[in-house]
């Protein structure tokens, strides 16, 4: 059994390791509210395109 077979072979069905950003596949700073599943960096980039408006 080589290294490639062992690496990342554990099932990830729940927890932080199971979810990733739909834009950049990052796993940190994920916004899951409203089913966005997008990291905070990508959210700042795509918020206007999604339909979020910044209030004064």
From Swiss-Prot:
Zn(2+) binds at residues 21, 24, 39, 42. The keyword Zinc applies. It comes from the Eukaryota. GO terms for cellular component: cytosolic small ribosomal subunit; ribosome; rough endoplasmic reticulum. Keywords: Cytoplasm, Endoplasmic reticulum, Metal-binding, Ribonucleoprotein, Ribosomal protein, Zinc. One of its GO terms (molecular function) is zinc ion binding. Its cofactor is Zn(2+). One of its GO terms (biological process) is cytoplasmic translation. The keyword Repeat does not apply. It is found in: Cytoplasm, Cytosol; Cytoplasm; Rough endoplasmic reticulum. Binds 1 zinc ion per subunit. Belongs to the universal ribosomal protein uS14 family. Component of the 40S small ribosomal subunit. PANTHER family: 40S RIBOSOMAL PROTEIN S29. NCBIfam families: PRK05766.1 (NF004424). This is Small ribosomal subunit protein uS14. The gene is RpS29.
């Amino acid at each position: 059994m080589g290294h490639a077979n062992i690496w990342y072979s554990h099932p990830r069905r729940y927890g932080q390791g199971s979810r990733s950003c739909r834009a950049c596949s990052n796993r940190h700073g994920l916004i899951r509210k409203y089913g966005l599943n997008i990291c905070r960096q990508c959210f700042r980039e795509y918020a206007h395109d999604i339909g979020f408006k910044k209030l004064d």
